[in-house]
Structure formats: C-alpha cells, structure tokens
Amino acid sequence: MHRPLPIKKILRYARNLLIFFFASTILAVIVYRFMPVYVTPLMVIRSVQQLASGDKPTWKHTWVSFDKISPHLPMAVIASEDNRFAEHNGFDFIEIEKAMKENEKRKRKRGASTISQQTAKNVFLWPQSSWVRKGFEVYFTFLIELFWSKERIMEVYLNSIEMGKGIYGAQATAKYKFNTTAAKLSSGQCALIAATLPNPIRFNSAKPSAYLLKRQKQILRLMNLVPKFPPVEKKAVDKKDTRKKKKK
C-alpha cells in the first residue's frame, strides 16, 4: 500500500492547523462581541509575576456595561491615546508616519498604537513586545474592527485595561482609587486615569505627581477638542429606533 510522502503529511497538518487557528480566533472574537471579558492574559501574567516575587496576587476587576461608565472617561482616553479613534479602521496611519519620523531623531521610541490595537493586545495576546506579537496584534485588530462596533471596542478597552497594580478596568479603578463608581467619575478624575495609562504601575491616579497633574490639564484641554463619543447623531438615531419599536 502506497504511503503518502512525509511532505504531504506536513502540508496536511499545516492546512488543518491554519483552519483551526482561523476558525477558533474568529469564533472567539464573535463570542466576545456579546460576552463580558472577565479575564485577560495580562491579568493572569501579572498574578503569576506577583506569586513569583513572593507577593500576594492582587486582582481587582469588575465588568460594567458602557452606559455605567462616566461619559468623561472615553473622551479622556481618546484625547490622551487615540484622537482619531472614531474615524480610523483600527490603524492610525497618520500617527504611524509621525512616529516613524520622530523615532529617527530620538533615542526613546514612541509608539502609535490605537485603542483598537491596545484592546486586541489586552484581550487576546501577551504584553511583551515582539514582531510575532505585533503580527498577531494586527490580525486581531482587523477582526475586532470587522465584528465589533466602535462602542463595543471602547467598552471592552475601558473594562480590561490595566489602571494600577492589580487593578483592571474603570469600575475597579473608581472604587479603589477614588472611592466611587465608574459612572460617577468626574472629568478631572478621568483625565488623571488617562494620564497614567502609558505606565499605570509607575503612575498613581490617586496620588498624582506634578507631572501627572500637568498631563491632566493637557488632557482636559484636549477633551474639549476631540469629537464626542459615541457621536451625538448615532445616539439620537438609536433613540428614534427604540421609540419606533415600542410603538409597534
């Protein structure tokens, strides 16, 4: 009986592996379009790191829906992290070009990751930077932009991002940093939270340094310049649709 050549077996395994990868990742993205994200790889990694260093693992995280988060917070992170979030398709090529030009002249490199890219990384990938992870990040960013709405991306981002040592998401940050709820965060508190995001372990929004307070003022000013999110027009259309359904 003729046996298939090893190369054919390898190709068949590779094909099956690719099919499994695409099917499982697309399914995961579709599931998370509707389901709250309670655990992320970063949460697990941070807990393991704390255990390895002899510390007690700290894991503070409570999922809340987008309408239970202060409207100032999405505005603050857009102003701070990604002012074209509502316009781009996951990648801000204007910022990428700017970063490339700036990085030619400076030692400390700056990134141009969008909120969509950060969400893809937070939910599906590991934090350590590498070309492999960047490749997967591009792939997952494409998928969430395809299957999720911008509001859903922002909802997941604000619920999953690291905002302090062992603190993840808006609700936990509001409780443990400001003794309030995510819905009641003020514009100033939201600007402080956004100011810590480049390094939430180093910066503490509850005890802001002079640098953090300066950055807070910058973000508050920028919040008045970026477009409202979600767009006012979209919210008005959603309300009209709801009223029509009730009448029927």
Swiss-Prot record:
Its main location: membrane. Pathway: Cell wall biogenesis; peptidoglycan biosynthesis. The keyword Cell wall biogenesis/degradation applies. It is found in: Cell inner membrane. GO terms for molecular function: pentosyltransferase activity; peptidoglycan glycosyltransferase activity. The keyword Cell membrane applies. GO terms for cellular component: peptidoglycan-based cell wall; plasma membrane. It is a single-pass membrane protein. Keywords: Cell inner membrane, Cell membrane, Cell shape, Cell wall biogenesis/degradation, Glycosyltransferase, Membrane, Peptidoglycan synthesis, Transferase, Transmembrane, Transmembrane helix. The chain crosses the membrane at residues 17-37. It catalyses: [GlcNAc-(1->4)-Mur2Ac(oyl-L-Ala-gamma-D-Glu-L-Lys-D-Ala-D-Ala)](n)-di-trans,octa-cis-undecaprenyl diphosphate + beta-D-GlcNAc-(1->4)-Mur2Ac(oyl-L-Ala-gamma-D-Glu-L-Lys-D-Ala-D-Ala)-di-trans,octa-cis-undecaprenyl diphosphate = [GlcNAc-(1->4)-Mur2Ac(oyl-L-Ala-gamma-D-Glu-L-Lys-D-Ala-D-Ala)](n+1)-di-trans,octa-cis-undecaprenyl diphosphate + di-trans,octa-cis-undecaprenyl diphosphate + H(+). Its EC number is 2.4.99.28. GO terms for biological process: cell wall organization; peptidoglycan biosynthetic process; regulation of cell shape. Peptidoglycan polymerase that catalyzes glycan chain elongation from lipid-linked precursors. Belongs to the glycosyltransferase 51 family. This is Biosynthetic peptidoglycan transglycosylase. The lineage of its organism: Bacteria, Pseudomonadati, Bacteroidota, Bacteroidia, Bacteroidales.
